[in-house]
Amino acid sequence: MLTEQQRRELDWEKTDGLMPVIVQHAVSGEVLMLGYMNPEALDKTIESGKVTFFSRTKQRLWIKGETSGNFLNVVSIAPDCDNDTLLVLANPIGPTCHKGTSSCFGNTAHQWLFLYQLEQLLAERKYADPETSYTAKLYASGTKRIAQKVGEEGVETALAATVHDRFELTNEASDLMYHLLVLLQDQDLDLTTVIENLHKRHQ
């Protein structure tokens, strides 16, 4: 969240009391929407942990999702270099746009977003009836079986690469990625944790 010093340095006069706020998906990086906050809306956002704007049409505060239930849960807030715009990283609950899309800017999602969506689906399957899907049955088989599948798919991926079969390599790599995501979910880990660890190693 914003530090006290950052909050004091925000240039509300420059923006006539309404500061533009860009909301970005905290995991995928997709730009979700643009809104406006006055000081009260910012305070409410920080206090509640849910993105709250000042509606220029209704002339009041409104919590994004107060009607639809599609809230934006705040992860972090940062000012730009001129202190007249805010960037909010958030985890959306449902689609952000009233048209039912993930972003108010249309289909702007990077292909990486699919991995996040797949991860969410795999998390839902974790407690599903094993008879309803392969994934649910895999979870029910236990960690050892899931780990075994990751090992098998890893070997098959490597073998496909050694014979330079790009088509088969793509298929086997897809299977490996899927089973690895299932294993991470089984251990209550996610891609974000892995990515953060890679960032630390890179520094």
Curated annotation (Swiss-Prot):
GO terms for cellular component: cytoplasm. Residues 115-203 are annotated as: Phosphoribosyl-ATP pyrophosphohydrolase. Pathway: Amino-acid biosynthesis; L-histidine biosynthesis; L-histidine from 5-phospho-alpha-D-ribose 1-diphosphate: step 2/9; Amino-acid biosynthesis; L-histidine biosynthesis; L-histidine from 5-phospho-alpha-D-ribose 1-diphosphate: step 3/9. Residues 1-114 are annotated as: Phosphoribosyl-AMP cyclohydrolase. Pfam families: PRA-CH (PF01502), PRA-PH (PF01503). InterPro entries: His_synth_HisIE, HisE, PRib-ATP_PPHydrolase-like, PRib_AMP_CycHydrolase_dom, PRib_AMP_CycHydrolase_sf. One of its GO terms (biological process) is L-histidine biosynthetic process. Keywords: Amino-acid biosynthesis, ATP-binding, Cytoplasm, Histidine biosynthesis, Hydrolase, Multifunctional enzyme, Nucleotide-binding. Transmembrane segments: none annotated. Gene3D superfamilies: MazG-like (1.10.287.1080), Phosphoribosyl-AMP cyclohydrolase (3.10.20.810). One of its GO terms (molecular function) is phosphoribosyl-ATP diphosphatase activity. Its EC number is 3.5.4.19, 3.6.1.31. It is an enzyme of class 3 (hydrolase). It catalyses: 1-(5-phospho-beta-D-ribosyl)-ATP + H2O = 1-(5-phospho-beta-D-ribosyl)-5'-AMP + diphosphate + H(+); 1-(5-phospho-beta-D-ribosyl)-5'-AMP + H2O = 1-(5-phospho-beta-D-ribosyl)-5-[(5-phospho-beta-D-ribosylamino)methylideneamino]imidazole-4-carboxamide. Its main location: cytoplasm. In the N-terminal section; belongs to the PRA-CH family. In the C-terminal section; belongs to the PRA-PH family. NCBIfam families: histidine_hisI, PRK00051.1, PRK02759.1. This is Histidine biosynthesis bifunctional protein HisIE.
